[in-house]
Amino acid sequence: MVCGGFTCSKNALCALNVVYMLVGVLLIIVAAWGKGFGIVSSIHIIGGVIAIGVFLLLIAIIGLIGAVSHHQVMLFIYMVVLILVFIFQFIVSCSCLAMNRSQQEYLLNTTWNRMSNETRLNLEKTLDCCGFLNTTEGRDEFKQDVALCIQVCSDPHKCPSCGDKMLNHADEALKILGGVGLFFSFTEILGVWLAFRYRNQKDPRANPSAFL
């Protein structure tokens, strides 16, 4: 049978959703591992990663059940959800790729200000740095951060700011994040196309007089 028939569409859709399931499980495992080993202490970060993993897992389960059973309603819900996820993910990915250094600095500064002291100290310990950026506007806060982390930094007299270290890698990280996001965006479009095509194909084993 040539690829494009009922069986081929079904197998391709199942394979795509198995990949989504593996990615979802991997996100959950990585988040739990990071929390267990103390790599990330913020419950908001851990909860966000786990929520994304669970959401992706649920979408994959709906798509897999719909593909195996050729369930019209499940396949329709699957397509609608994937389209919405694609739109959101595409916008976020393009924003990551288009972000300049000043925008990166503003975003990192906003994130830094929302961090708890415990999260800041863990980040400073991991990056071997103190404070965010020693700017005119944030000099007082920078001095307070340096005073808190002076024992954490391996070399207190030559301790760089965390903002400088993060900005040095932010551009590369955003490009990777945007590229991976765009890749998954197009796999979601592939999933929508496969689900639409498969949904409108008749099961050759079904009753010929039955609807699809």
Swiss-Prot record:
| Source organism superkingdom | Eukaryota
Glycosylated where? Answer: 100, 109, 117, 134
Topology feature Cytoplasmic, residues: 1-12, 66-72, 197-212
Is Zinc-finger one of the keywords UniProt gives this record? no
InterPro entries recorded: Tetraspanin/Peripherin, Tetraspanin_animals
Indicate yes or no for the key word DNA-binding: no
Protein's membrane topology: Multi-pass membrane protein
Task: From the Swiss-Prot or TrEMBL record, state where the protein is found.
Answer: Membrane
Q: Which residues lie on this side of the membrane: Extracellular?
A: 34-44, 94-175
Give TM regions.
Answer: 13-33, 45-65, 73-93, 176-196
PANTHER family given in the database record: TETRASPANIN (PTHR19282), TETRASPANIN-31 (PTHR19282:SF3)
Similarity annotation: Belongs to the tetraspanin (TM4SF) family.
**What name goes with this protein?**
Tetraspanin-31-B
State which gene encodes it.
tspan31-b
